[in-house]
Structure formats: C-alpha cells, structure tokens
C-alpha cells in the first residue's frame, strides 16, 4: 500500500525527523520510506547494507541519462543522540516556530536529505541532459562508516560523477575543503614488577609519555613550518592525544598503557608520513631517556581514517554552485 508523497521538502522533513535514526541504531525504516517515495516517482534505487546488520543501510538512486557524468546529492541519515540534552520540544517531532523547523537532524542533515529526495522526484519529470544521483548513508557521525560500503559498491560506476554536493550545514556558504582525519590506538607494553625494583622493568607509562612528548613536538613543528590552508580556523595539520589509560596500582610498574590520538591533516599533508615521524621521534626519546634494551616502541593500530578534501575555488563545480546559491 502506497503512502502519499509529501507536497514539499518541509513536509518530508517533518516525516524524516520522526525516524529516530540515531547513529549505531537501525535506519532502515527511514530508508524504506525514501525508497518507496522514489519508487512512486518511477525511480529505481539500490540498497547497500552494513554487512553486519541489514537494518542499517545506504541508498543510491539515479535519474536521467547514465552515459554522461552527472551530479550527486549526498547526505547522511543518522543523527547524534539526544540523551541528557535540555530540549524544550520533543526532539523527534518536528516543531515549527518563527518560520523554522526544530527537531533532531533538522539541520544536520535531514533538511538537506528532504530537499535532495524532493529534487530527485521533480527531476524524474524533466528531460535531463545529465543524470542526478542520490546517495544516502548511515553512521556518518562516527567517522563516515556507512558510506565506505557505498563507495566500494560504486567503484565500477562509469562515467564517474562530475560533481558531488554534500549538504552539511554551512550557513549556505560553499565549503570547498575539509581536513582529513586518522584516529589511532597505541598500546605501550612494559613489564609488571614491584615499584621498589622499578629500574629493572620496562615502564609502559614511560613509553606512553615519550609518545605523547613526540606528538607535542611534531605538533609544534607542523604549526611553525607545516603547510597552511587559510580557510580553516586552525590552518595547519593538528595532532592530538585524547585519552590515556594504564597501570593497576601505584606500587606496580605498569605492564600496559593505551593512548588514543589523532591526526587532522590539511590536504597537502600525508598522515602516514606524520605518523612515521611521531614513531621515529618516540624511539629517539626512548633511547635518550635510557630505556631498557628490551623496551619496545608503541604498537599502533589505525582505528578510523578518511581523506581530506581540497576543491579548487575556481573549479567548474564551485562556479556552478555559486550560480544557484
């Protein structure tokens, strides 16, 4: 049984807000609703689900000729949690005040999703010279998790799109760049022993402190001498240690210490090269501090990463966008 198609984007936004598609929870009801609306307009769509949970899914759809490069409208369907926040209206009910619609995700970014879906439906009635594509993803808020599956599925797509418009909230300004990010977990290993004999054992926290010191030194060098992109509030690559956990008791030399850190890089910087610098400097600091011969450097694993974006401001895509803002 079909349900009526909304008359406009605000009406669809009200529907979308009602789906509690919080990150890491199922979004399939929202996706099914969008898919049904597209089908009613004669637009086929494809789902690319999370391999571990089919209730979380991406959606991809196209209208127009597929033998020429087109434009992608891309948005995520997940929203951040509302727990513990002082909402004055139900977060998953659209509330209109003073010409604005309030609700979780109204700006980030179900408002754009609603506009994109309605644009697809209207485009299906037009003789398009280029295709219009719709890409909806899940779990963007925790590191663009869902779209990775979608991108792999779209790799064979030919011809590649001419332009992708990602409708994140920008106060209607055109954003041409975004820093890349790489998050890491470092396990620093030592040897447990009584603190009265501490010099005989490798102290994992000491290794972690050498790592953190190296992070600070590399950060200082990047701030002073690294490439700069003036469009950002912090115009250079940053490194940051966010959490540290280690040790079991004051009188026991710690056998393990875990440090979680990240690199947020401008497009000109390679996070792999920065990580290599950090680890080389960590080893240098360990030797300088007189680390025992069997002390090993931190074991680093990548938790999450995504590349940065640097679109030339004189590109055809930016020029096209400026015409329609």
Regions found by a protein language model. Name each.
Residues 4, 185-324:
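Metal-dependent amide/peptide-bond hydrolase catalytic core
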Residues 14, 114-117, 121, 148-151, ...:
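Predominant activation on well-ordered alpha-helical scaffold segments within soluble catalytic domains
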Residues 54-57, 65-68, 179-181, 233-237, ...:
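A short, glycine/Asx- and small/polar-enriched loop/turn
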Residues 82-96, 161, 176-187:
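Acidic-glycine-rich active-site phosphate/pyrophosphate-binding loop
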């Amino acid at each position: 049984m079909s349900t009526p198609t909304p008359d406009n984007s605000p009406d669809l936004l009200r529907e979308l807000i009602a789906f509690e598609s919080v990150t890491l929870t199922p979004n399939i009801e929202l996706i099914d609703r969008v898919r049904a609306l597209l089908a009613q307009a004669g637009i086929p769509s494809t789902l690319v689900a999370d391999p571990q949970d089919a209730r979380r899914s991406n959606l991809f759809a196209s209208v127009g000729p597929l033998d020429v490069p087109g434009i992608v409208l891309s948005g995520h369907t997940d929203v951040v949690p509302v727990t513990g926040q002082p909402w004055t209206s139900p977060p998953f009910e659209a509330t209109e005040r003073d010409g604005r619609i309030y609700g979780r995700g109204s700006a980030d970014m179900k408002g754009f999703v609603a506009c994109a879906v309605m644009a697809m439906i209207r485009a299906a009635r037009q003789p398009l010279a280029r295709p219009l594509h719709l890409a909806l993803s899940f779990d963007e808020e925790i590191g663009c998790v869902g779209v990775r599956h979608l991108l792999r599925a779209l790799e064979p797509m030919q011809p590649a799109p001419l332009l992708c418009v990602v409708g994140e909230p920008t106060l209607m300004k055109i954003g041409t760049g975004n820093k890349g990010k790489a998050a890491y977990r470092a396990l620093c290993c030592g040897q447990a022993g009584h603190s009265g004999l501490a010099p005989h054992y490798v102290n994992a926290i000491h290794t972690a402190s050498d790592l953190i010191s190296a992070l600070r030194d590399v950060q200082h060098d990047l701030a002073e001498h690294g490439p700069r992109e003036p469009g950002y509030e912090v115009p250079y690559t940053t490194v940051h240690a966010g959490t540290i956990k280690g040790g079991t008791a004051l009188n026991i030399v710690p056998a393990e210490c875990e440090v979680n850190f990240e690199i947020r890089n401008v497009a000109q910087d390679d996070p792999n090269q920065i990580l290599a610098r950090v680890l080389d400097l960590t080893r240098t600091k360990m030797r300088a501090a007189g680390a025992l011969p069997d002390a090993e450097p931190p074991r680093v694993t990548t938790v999450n990463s995504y590349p940065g974006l640097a679109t030339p401001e004189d590109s055809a895509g930016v020029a096209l966008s400026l015409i329609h803002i």
